[in-house]
């Protein structure tokens, strides 16, 4: 498919997840409706990850595409009808007998994802070492956490140009090269092993490089170690605490077999969230989630949340923006050359600010323009004028004077306060 065809095919899929409930706003949101170019709901302004939008099939397609053309193709399967790669995530079902008075009932626990290891006991141990609220048990808080992190850590628009908004043919080409590069140089999937197994792998790898002369010495050294020494010789790369013998550890092939992590420590170095499904990006001695690895390589537009591949873009308020996306967060008018106010780290045009966000003057009860001087005390505001900032009793101007605040009123003296409050 040529670049022109790819560009024409692009779309944000506005029908996807339409009407899905917001997990954050609950009934306050009428249901998910995707903004034309922002990755947020038009109704409540929350992100896609805050809504119950993605189905398991859509998640598996996204991760399947991420693993396409990588060494992790064993984790995907291609659909016969359209050839789309699907992520073969490992679902683990544990059946635990529960004793009852007369008979034994069966308690079945389904994990929506589990480490793809042959030893189910090891996978069970891994899960138990995660915080309970982050264990992806079907229908639980942990399953919802995993779903949210899939959306947050691995945005589809960080790997698929067709999920982006109006890229030029040149930007499509640059993005494809960028994705190919990070798949080859940074993308990885963690593996769960016992620390001793990792040492064997590392020793085998060293033997390939240094010949057989070191083999007998290495084996002899391992045999001489007591159980206590074995338990203390491994430490977590993140928290530096010792690994307990018999506990599973996570390793990342790109980091090397000499580095281990506790299951709960296998997190992104930027957001400190568990790396969803142990999918990591390795750079300069650090683990990243997909989002924050990409952020370390490319500027990200604070408006549309996409990576910026254009040479020209705007920097404002410590953030980056596509030229066409530096817009009012409320009405989407372009803000280049206009007065704007930052509200919760989002730029808002002057009219929208006055209408929806401005402080109200206690004197005249009108909105206070962002460029006008004002007096603020606790949660009360006044225009800094002779007409508004007055004694609530005698109307004396209080600008530059001492005053006594009482429940939204201000007084020039104790006498005026007594008169008004009596």
From Swiss-Prot:
Residue intervals of the LIM zinc-binding domain: 234-297, 299-359, 362-422
One protein family per Pfam: LIM
Region described as Disordered: 198-224
Main location: cytoplasm
UniProt GO BP: negative regulation of cell population proliferation
PROSITE patterns in UniProt: LIM_DOMAIN_1, LIM_DOMAIN_2, PET
Subcellular location: Cytoplasm; Cell junction, Focal adhesion
Domain of life: Eukaryota
PET domain: residues covered: 92-199
One GO MF term: zinc ion binding
CDD domains in the record: LIM1_Testin, LIM2_Testin, LIM3_Testin, PET_testin
Function: Scaffold protein that may play a role in cell adhesion, cell spreading and in the reorganization of the actin cytoskeleton. May play a role in the regulation of cell proliferation. May inhibit cell growth.
Domain remark text: The N-terminal and the C-terminal halves of the protein can associate with each other, thereby hindering interactions with other proteins.
Protein name (Swiss-Prot/TrEMBL): Testin
Gene of this entry: TES
